[in-house]
Amino acid sequence: METAALEFGSAGYEHASLNRIIEQCAMSKSSFYYILSSKAELYEFVLQELIAEVAAEIDVVAPEHFAGTEFWSKVERYFANLISVSQREHSFLLLGRMFYLQAPDPVKTAVATTLGAVREWVHEVLRVGRRCGAVRTDLPEPLQAELVFAILQVFDEWTIAHYADFSASALQNLAVAQFATIRRTLAP
């Protein structure tokens, strides 16, 4: 699986070579095609496996966990924990690289489903923050939810694309600055 994820992540979906993947896995083509019938099926399989690995490493808390006067400190701790786990677990980077590939729509079902769930969770956390007075209410809630999700995606995609350019401490500093940007955008 890691071989395929590395191939997709480095070459992109269109240029990823099944022959290279099969060769690096020391499989015969007939064995590979007995298990999976196409590049699209392999891509979906790898995505599903990486999503499961990442999900097993994250404690997704109920949005109500953030309610109250400690909203921002709770969100900051949660964000810091996500960053820490993502730097420790290589599967996060592999998944991130595959998430942002240009791939045909039919093979992006797992990405769309996962992003939809994350988008809804972020919206619910935002709603909790608005209710407890920690998040500004001068923008319509749906617009604000789209804005914060777009910012998070830009941060994620950019960080993944430039991951190798940073030391571990520089990545940590970047994460702190990214969180501060979100807080400045949302706090009253």
Go through the PLM ranges and name each one.
Residues 10-14, 89, 132:
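Short coil/turn segments at alpha/beta junctions that flank glycine-rich nucleotide-binding fingerprints
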Residues 7-41, 45:
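Helix-turn-helix
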Residues 45, 59-88, 141-148, 175:
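Hydrophobic alpha-helical connector segments
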Residues 93-94, 108, 112, 130-179:
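Hydrophobic/aromatic-rich alpha-helical bundle segments in the mid-to-C-terminal region
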Residues 83-123, 143:
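Short secondary-structure transition hinges
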Residues 46, 50, 54, 58, ...:
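Hydrophobic recognition helices of helix-based DNA-binding modules
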Residues 4-8, 82:
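Short hydrophobic clusters on alpha-helical segments that form packing/core surfaces
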Residues 1-2, 14-15, 35-59, 76-80, ...:
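An amphipathic alpha-helix adjacent to DNA-recognition modules
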